[in-house]
From Swiss-Prot:
Disulfide bonds: none annotated. The gene is pnp. PANTHER family: POLYRIBONUCLEOTIDE NUCLEOTIDYLTRANSFERASE, POLYRIBONUCLEOTIDE NUCLEOTIDYLTRANSFERASE 1, MITOCHONDRIAL. This is Polyribonucleotide nucleotidyltransferase. Belongs to the polyribonucleotide nucleotidyltransferase family. It comes from Thermus thermophilus (strain ATCC BAA-163 / DSM 7039 / HB27).
Length: 713
């Protein structure tokens, strides 16, 4: 209870965000961590901890790891795994970890080499307010309170677009009707990260949404600053790694220019450029290394010169772009690399395409499956399945490297999700195309922009498969070089340009508008005009790519491929579902012996899947026969099943029979039914009447009007 001496009191900082309380608490839980903060938003609660190692590690990068841990008790569920405990993070947890990692990573000081671990644990999820946007807020607050050097704070918000108006932090229910799902993380001065899924939204609306998000996150930043002023620990002392003095770096840069660095950097081929650059670096460093009196180079300084050479390369590449408008492969800022496209490349795949842009190449494939192929989602959401899957594979050979294959990487999960969001907006409704659809993007070559090439290849493969998408989708990766109020926007960036730029963003969409956007900003606040110009330049490139795609395949194919499963649908009365299934599933098993799969939904919808159309048609006929209902006035070819003294029972179709009374068998008086009919005879009969108990009276249509119908008492 509150006030008990043994229970530490939490420090609470609170505000109202989109009509719901946002609370930051610290000082009560996980106190041995360098920084720990509990964040509550309505009934969604996450705990973030920040910890750094006491000593630096030998590395030339920031050793930061971010984990996003989902606890199933947060939604009152027991995990569905065999061990009934949480295992490896699922896709949503990986995406949430990346959403936290990307905006905090650029704010660590350059050269900081202490291991840093951020763990965000979801303790409660109210099924209304998604916990993913709380990850960056909680991680930022924990870092602010810790002794870890970090130039925060940051905050994150989600923006929806409903009825033409922006909605701050829409609930999961509101997102279902929103035209936009935009997550923005930023600092006071700048937007640092953007993730968006959109329903063909125009560029001006996106810029307005970004501005709206940045404005609305400011109170969260102020709340963290207030907490840090009162509670933050002193920052740890750390020593930056040794580097060359600035004057030696400058001398190395001038020497590199004299020896022809610019020409080496403008070698068109990635492989040739890498080899030429490595040889150039070796010669340059050997020349630049200080020599002893005996002429022996100071090998101890070689790592410093190698590190400085990377800075020299980055500086010269940026200079070429800013001052001369030249890029490493000789293109201008707005130029696309050469593109070639193939479709229908695999004989057995349900849809396939190869999209090649410069030295980036992706094989896209589509597989159509049944309802049984849907992915079961065992996460913190409501129990549901997923019918549209997009998977991205990035093997080491695509970059000419050797690397152990250790399963799916976080990067592969993130890129696959980006491609999925790009394509999702144009996918057909389930009632129009009831297949489970899996798109796979296998990267065969990579030199930048492979995720956007996956969007293009995946779209072409969908069209090749005959999936009736609403419009083609293309994607392009953009870059920005920004210096002293000078900005050059680069279209279709190389891997080399991705590393040297100040911002990279990937834009996918149709001719009508944007369907997905991902952005990472490494510099301060960018003017609105630059953001809009970048989006418009991306649109210009996207339209050119769509022109090329539509030249090869103008529209989805009208027919499915021969090996794709066929789906036939029909509706049966709910009360007859049991009849279709049969005792112990007997009837369904009999249908499956035809080589089909049968799915039956609670509303009576029956779907039949088979790669053999004739088998599917036969199964459909059997189900229709099982569930048919006789109608007054309809004529049937029936089979005599029983003879009685008062008439003959005729089977109209499986499960349904009627009585042909003795008075209706022939003109005149009939003494014995057996004189006119025998079991097994097939005759035409017409339904004359169905009583309230469902009993059917039949007549012979050829005798109608010649003998009066029987009257029931």
């Amino acid at each position: 209870m509150e006030g008990t001496p043994n229970v530490p009191q939490a420090h609470r900082y609170e505000l109202t965000l989109a009509g719901r309380p946002l609370v930051l608490e610290t000082g009560k839980y996980a106190k041995q961590a360098s920084g720990s903060v509990l964040v509550r938003y309505a009934d969604t609660v996450v705990l973030a901890t920040a910890q750094a190692s006491e000593t630096p590690v030998e590395a030339d990068f920031l050793p930061l790891t971010v984990e996003f841990e989902e606890r199933h008790y947060a939604v009152g569920k027991i995990p569905g795994s065999f061990m009934r405990r949480e295992g490896r993070p699922g896709e949503k947890a990986i995406l949430s970890a990346r959403m936290t990692d990307r905006p905090i990573r650029p704010l660590f000081p350059k050269g900081f080499r202490h291991e840093v671990q951020i763990i965000v644990t979801v303790l409660s999820a109210d099924q209304k307010n998604p916990p993913d946007i709380l990850g960056p807020i909680a991680a930022s607050a924990a870092l602010m309170l810790s002794d870890i050097p970090w130039e925060g704070p940051i905050a994150a918000v989600r923006v929806g677009l409903i009825g033409g108006s922006f909605v701050l932090n829409p609930t999961l229910q509101e997102l279902e009707e929103s035209q936009l799902d935009l997550v923005v993380a930023g600092s006071k001065e700048a937007i640092l990260m953007v993730e968006a899924e959109a329903g063909e939204v125009d560029e001006e609306t996106l810029v307005q949404a970004l501005e709206f998000a940045h404005k609305e996150m400011q109170p969260i930043l102020e709340l963290q600053e207030a907490m840090a002023r009162e509670l933050a620990k002193p920052k740890m002392a750390w020593t930056p790694p040794e580097s060359l003095p600035e004057e030696e770096k400058e001398a190395l840069y001038r020497l590199a220019l004299e020896r022809g660095l610019s020409q080496v950097l403008q070698t068109a081929s990635k492989g040739e450029r890498s080899r030429a650059l490595a040889e150039f670096a070796e010669r340059l460093i050997a020349e630049a290394l200080p020599k002893g009196e005996d002429g022996t180079p100071d090998e101890g300084k070689k790592p410093l010169y190698e590190s400085a050479f990377d800075e020299v390369v980055r500086r010269e590449l940026r200079r070429l772009v800013l001052e001369e408008g030249k890029r490493a492969d000789g293109r201008g800022p707005k130029d696309l690399r050469p593109i070639w496209i193939e479709v229908d490349v695999l004989p057995r795949a349900h849809g396939s395409a190869v999209f090649t842009r410069g030295e980036t190449q992706v094989l896209g494939t589509v597989t159509l499956g049944t309802g049984r192929d849907e992915q079961i989602l065992d996460d913190l959401g409501i129990d549901e399945t997923e019918k549209f899957l997009v998977h991205y594979n990035f093997p080491p050979f695509s970059t000419g490297e050797v690397r152990r294959l250790r399963g799916v990487s976080r990067r592969e999960v993130g890129h696959g999700n980006l491609a999925k969001r790009a394509l999702k907006a144009v996918m057909p409704k389930e009632e129009d195309f009831p297949y489970t659809i899996r798109v796979v993007g296998d990267v065969l070559e990579s030199n930048g922009s492979s995720s956007m090439a996956t969007v293009c290849a995946g779209c072409l493969a969908l069209m090749d498969a005959g999936v009736p998408i609403r419009a083609p989708v293309a994607g392009v990766a953009m870059g920005l070089v920004w210096e002293e109020n000078r900005a050059v926007i680069l279209t279709d960036i190389l891997g080399l340009e991705d590393a040297l730029g100040d911002m990279d963003f990937k834009v996918a969409g149709t001719r009508k508008g944007v369907t997905a956007l991902q952005m990472d900003n490494k510099v301060g606040g960018l003017p609105r005009e630059v953001l809009k110009e970048a989006l418009l330049q991306a649109r210009e490139a996207r339209l050119k790519i769509l022109d090329l795609m539509e030249t090869v395949l103008p529209a989805p194919r009208p027919e499915l491929k021969p090996f794709a499963p066929r789906i036939l649908s029909l509706k049966v009365p709910v009360e007859k579902i049991g009849l279709v299934i049969g005792p112990g599933g007997k009837n369904v098993r009999a249908l499956e012996e035809l080589g089909v799969e049968v799915d039956i939904e609670e509303d009576g919808t029956v779907r039949i899947y088979s790669s053999d159309l004739n088998a599917a048609l036969e199964a459909k006929k059997r189900i229709e026969d099982l569930t048919r209902e006789a109608k007054v006035g309809e004529i049937y070819e029936g089979t005599v099943t029983r003879i009685t003294p008062f008439g003959a029972f005729i089977s109209l179709f499986p499960g349904t029979e009627g009585l042909l009374h003795i008075s209706q068998i022939a003109p005149g008086r009939v003494e014995r039914v057996e004189d006119h009919l025998k079991v097994g005879d097939v005759i035409k009969v017409k339904v004359h009447r169905i009583d309230e108990r469902g009993k059917i009276d039949l007549i012979r249509p050829e005798l109608e009007g010649k003998i009066p119908p029987r009257r029931r008492k």
